[in-house]
């Protein structure tokens, strides 16, 4: 919807929603593309937004019932997602893992401060639950960036101490597994090449099988890894050469009945359409 501004500079909108929702709010400064913000909306709760423009800078000030949640959500988004504070170039300039931990703490301090102003304890609990996952992801992103820049993070004592504390059989620590695998295969580019040339997606699933014996974790993460390998196909990419290897590794460790059935069917289709395969009517 487009909100019309009254002659006195105010605007308002009443929105009926069934539950809590984050909505994009775009503000056009008349020059560049619209600036987008996130509004935290909740049924029967008010949110006030003051748009303050000073020269070429636009600042939004939030108040009302969900003002603190909205303020936190935008500070989090601006710090973690939109800024370059956690980009590969930034990571590569940080000398070691100990410095990385301190840097992350400093950059996330304003986000933590904004969360302390939120009185909605359900919201706070949900954010704190995801906080550890986010920080672990940032640590592994740092390790991957350094590894790609030629730094062997396996020799960083503090980083390996952090890695060795992760229990990969614990379902509560499952969020750390995918970024760990991403780093591990980056640090070990010759995995399994002595036996066979596996595509990276298949390598990741095989590493998962060696990393954890917990079947729930295996099913959860193998589904995530398989989905990541199938996603390019949705965008029109040809994955026909790599996906059979991925399916076969997936079938070795997953017990998910629906996904296993899908993988088996897809492998049969691939095998039946591979050049050089006899048509069904010609098979003896």
Task: Enumerate the language-model features and the residues they cover.
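A non-transmembrane, solvent-exposed segment enriched in polar/low-complexity residues
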Residues: 1-126, 134-142
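Short coil/turn connectors between adjacent alpha-helices in alpha-solenoid helical repeat scaffolds
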Residues: 97-99, 141-152, 191-197, 233-239
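Alpha-helical repeat scaffolds
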Residues: 150-165, 199-211, 240-251, 260, ...
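Extended amphipathic alpha-helical segments with heptad-repeat/coiled-coil character used for oligomerization
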Residues: 129-192
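Structural signature of alpha-solenoid helical repeat junctions
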Residues: 120-130, 222, 259
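N-terminal "domain-start" segment that seeds a small globular fold
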Residues: 258-284
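Solenoid-like repeat scaffolds
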Residues: 116-119, 212-217, 250-254
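Extended alpha-helical scaffolding segments
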Residues: 219-253
